[in-house]
C-alpha cells in the first residue's frame, strides 16, 4: 500500500533508508538484519541480490458476459506472464539460487468486467549480479511475450534492490567486539 501511495519507492527497507537520507552520516553498518530468537548474530552466509519490478499491463475493458470480444484482458496477460516466468525455472543454474517472486497488486474492478489494467510486483533474486541480471532479462522476456500474446500494452519499471552479499571469513574482529558488548552466549556465529 505504501508503494502504491508513492510513500515507499523500493522493495527493501535498507534501500528506502538510504533514499530518505537516514544513512547519510553513517560510515559503516555492522548489523543490518533482524533474526528471531537471537539477540545478536554473525552471519557467515550469503544473501541474494535482487531487482524489483513494477509491471503494468494495459488492455481494454468490456462486459465479460455480453461483449467479451470487445475487450483486451490485462488479467489474461498477467496470468500468461506468471506461467511464462514459472516455466523459466529450469533455465536457472542451481548454484545461482535464482528465485523469482510475483503477485498481482491490482487486478481488475469486477468479475463481470474485462480488466483493462493490471499491476504486478515482481522480484528477481540470485546469488550473483550476473545471475540476477540474467533472471531479470528472462522475466522481462516473459512479460513481453504475455503482452504480445494478449494484445495488451506493457510498462516495466525496474528498480535496483540489494547487491548480493558474500560472507567475510575474516570476522574475528567483530567477534571480539561482540564478546565485549554482549552477555555470554547472546550471539551466534552462523556458518
Predicted regions and their residues:
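Conserved short loop/turn motifs at secondary-structure junctions
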Residues: 1-4, 159-164, 191
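Acidic-enriched catalytic cores of C-N bond-cleaving enzymes acting on peptides and small amides
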Residues: 68-105, 110-113, 128-157, 167-173, ...
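Short, solvent-exposed polar/charged micro-motifs at secondary-structure junctions
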Residues: 38-41, 165-169
